[in-house]
């Protein structure tokens, strides 16, 4: 049964025009919410989809998670393929996309592994817009064998080489691939995982079109974390990197 929607779009939306993005308001239009841990603000895929694709284009999100990108693609009249290894995530995605509106795109949801999306032909996708897990910082399942959120950083980066190769294979020449990645800290030192992923995609053949800093608003320097930041002499990570790659 389709949901009753009270608000279809964000208020006073303007396309971002610089390389620092900050969205204190998570976004509560359509079916969006912040209940899926680690999901990105809908302002991010909205900006990316509007800037790097056209109505009727085919968009791919192979780490679909809570379904934010699916909802935005449908609202913006793009067709989208959403993939995830997690059946719970896919069920949530189906619920989130269960609405009707004129001039909406179609949503295709499929269980699958981002390292092998062979059901998609070569050079068939117009835009890739995705938000992978950051290794095992947040684990999204307990026992799914192909879940990359179970992997430690070195193993995760090795598997992301396969993801990058598949992205390059399915994306049309001249089109764009956008990926949000974060870093982590281990034993008191920064692990620049995002830049490792950037290099992996460059090695796969992509050119870096944009490097955007995205501010995190769930990282409050209060209480427990503020105390430990001072006590153990480390800074709280309050940003992520949004890479936009170009397939020439």
Where are these regions (language model features)?
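Class I S-adenosyl-L-methionine-dependent methyltransferase catalytic core
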Residues: 1-248
């Amino acid at each position: 049964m389709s949901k009753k929607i009270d608000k279809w779009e964000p208020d006073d939306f303007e396309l971002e025009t610089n390389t620092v993005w900050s969205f204190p308001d998570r976004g509560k239009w359509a079916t969006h919410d912040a209940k899926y841990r680690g999901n990105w603000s809908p302002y991010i895929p909205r900006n990316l989809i509007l800037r790097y694709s056209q109505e009727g284009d085919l968009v791919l999100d192979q780490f679909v998670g809570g379904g934010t990108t699916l909802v935005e693609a449908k609202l913006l009249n793009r067709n989208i393929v959403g993939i995830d290894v997690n059946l719970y995530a896919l069920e949530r995605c189906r619920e989130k996309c269960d609405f009707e509106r004129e001039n909406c795109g179609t949503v295709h949801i499929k269980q699958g592994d981002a390292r092998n999306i062979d059901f998609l032909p070569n050079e068939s996708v117009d835009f890739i817009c995705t938000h992978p897990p950051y290794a095992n910082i947040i684990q999204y399942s307990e026992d799914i064998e192909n879940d990359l959120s179970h992997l430690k950083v070195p193993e995760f980066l090795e598997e992301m080489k396969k993801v990058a190769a598949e992205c390059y294979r399915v994306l049309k020449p001249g089109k764009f691939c956008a990926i949000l990645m974060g870093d982590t800290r281990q034993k008191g030192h920064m692990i620049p995982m995002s830049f490792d992923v950037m290099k992996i995609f460059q090695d796969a053949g992509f050119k870096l079109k944009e490097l955007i800093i995205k501010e995190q608003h769930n990282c409050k320097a209060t209480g427990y974390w503020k105390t430990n930041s001072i006590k153990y002499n480390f800074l709280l990570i309050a940003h992520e990197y949004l890479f936009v790659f170009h397939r020439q």
